[in-house]
Amino acid sequence: VFSTMMTDSQTTDVPSRPSIGVRIGRIAFLVVAGIVVIAVAAAFFVTWTIQRSFPQTSGSLELDGLSADVTVQRDSQGIPTITADTTGDLFFAEGFVHAQDRFFEMDFRRHVTAGRVAEMFGESQAGTDAFLRTLGWRKVAEAEVAAMDETTLGYYEAYADGVNAYLASRSGAELSLEYAVIGMQNPDYQPEPWEPADSVAWLKAMAWDLRGNIEDETERALLAAELDGGEGAIATPETQALLEKLYPAYPFDENPVIVPKITAVPEGGTDADAASATLPDDTGIQDASATIEWEETSSVIEAASILVGDVGEGIGSNSWVVSGSLAESGMPLLANDPHLGASLPSVWYQVQLKCSTVDDECPFDVGGFSFSGLPGVVIGHNQSIAWGFTNLTTDVTDLYVERIQGDQYWRDGALVPLEERTETIKVAGGDDIELTIRSTGHGPIISGLTDDSTAIADDPLPGLTADPATGAGISEVPGEDAEYAVSLRWTALDPGTAATAVFALSTAQDFDDFRAAASLFDVPAQNLIYADTSGNIGYQTPGRLPIRGAGDGWMPQPGWDSSYDWTGFIPFEELPVSYNPSSGYIVTANNAIVADDYAYFLSRDWDYGYRAARIVHLIERRAAVAPLTAEDMREIQLDSEMWIGKR
């Protein structure tokens, strides 16, 4: 036995010290162990943070605001089918499900459409907010909501109630992982309750995405100034001719138009009241008859387009429908691939909405694609009809060069007061910004907000529209001490009825109903194709399409001369329509709608029709061999041959 004992000299045995290597090993072990513990804890925290935002997709939930039980059945891909006894419960549930899956996307979108992105992400977004506030999408949406019929407003309110029911049960990162990230730089941010105007405003964003030729018009004006090489002069005929070469006309003799011949609609025309129970009584629809990309050019416009989800350069939408006479099934086949901007998550949200009993009180049994944040189904089919969209590419935007003198502008030889309003842009982590927005009778002044519109205002005359015979609009420029500015005239800046059309399309039962719904689909203007279970196919040009006085909007127009104003819009009953054409098919691919002898000006900036020509070729080639099938439609959609380089 080894033992020690105390002696008078107070001595003890002293253990030997570990070697340096052993001590380093112990320290390394402790460091590694600490790192592992921290990593495990971090992984647990991240997993917990992510998973707590996952929605409940099975079992039952008790929600205030429902009048009866609602069933939400998701398939293996998470696509929901919502079944309810009433329209109120149906759209309440759609709002709840959209919020479950996409609320951060919805919240972000409404900040974009309201010009409030800086509230979420700080000063870097203030310039984009200023541009979007100037356009005033949110104010237009609020005006549309105020003008809605009681039934349609009820759908939007029920949807908002459903979104808010989800918000009531969660907050912060429980709603979406992104809120945990935002909280790091903006800890005070809290999502607001959802409102109907939040939904309607997204249609304005889609109209911007599909706005047409504003970039082309801007580019031509800048090119005219560059090519002429001198300030203050009207573009020479040589410059005008060069621009015509750079932007050639549509090749009508080479590529197809959508409606070669306007065909008669079914006997009886279009009865607006027959469209569905969801339509207001005062739609004003009359019986119809058979009459008749450059890259983004400004940093702010580009930023707004990116936030919305721009279509990108060289991308276009396609749709076509073939009659049963060309199909193996003996029934029509409809294909549609609308090319909106790529985003994650997708701009589309697939859903099916079903009333337990389909009747006048609850008329919906529709499936297809919606926008998260918007009630209803935008593109899809019900039990009687199917429909699809492509961008109409008509010219619905014009730039006007204005002569500004102080707080007034020149108009037909007289000074008229500018309209002004002030808005406050709130900035996360920064000071509020006061924004003064000025407008003329044409629309908001955008020069000073975008580089290119400012460049046009600095040297506008070379790119200005003028009557080549008389020089009207430019021979007398008023106000020698005035300054130039650029304003925007755009159909989407006036209240419309597209928010109602979504429901009218979903409940349409035949071509008359479809056209009545199309008459409400004013902005964004879209090619609408149609098929029904009775074997009919059809097409309708809808939209608020301007009738111009002098000029055609190909270049900026002199705002001081009212002869260049829009004088109205093409009556719906005179817009192109096709019903069961003899060809047995209808193809739309952003190409020209009708021949150039149509009674009204539509655009000079069509897609040149090579995609449409290729689709027509494939349909005719395959139909000549055997009746078409759904697989044939899919293969045509996936076709990658580009004819512009071959013809």
Regions found by a protein language model. Give the residues of each.
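N-terminal Lys/Arg-rich, disordered targeting/topogenic segments
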Residues: 2-24
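Substrate-recognition/specificity elements adjacent to catalytic centers across diverse enzyme folds
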Residues: 7-8, 30, 43-333, 338, ...
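N-terminal Sec-pathway targeting helices
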Residues: 18-38
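Second-shell loop/turn segments in exported
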Residues: 90-93, 130-131, 139-153, 489, ...
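Ordered core of a single globular domain
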Residues: 214-237, 241, 249-250, 265, ...
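Short active-site loop/helix that positions an aromatic residue
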Residues: 339-356, 508-522
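Compact, glycine/acidic-enriched structural inserts
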Residues: 359-443, 505
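Hydrophobic alpha-helical segments
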Residues: 447, 451, 520-622
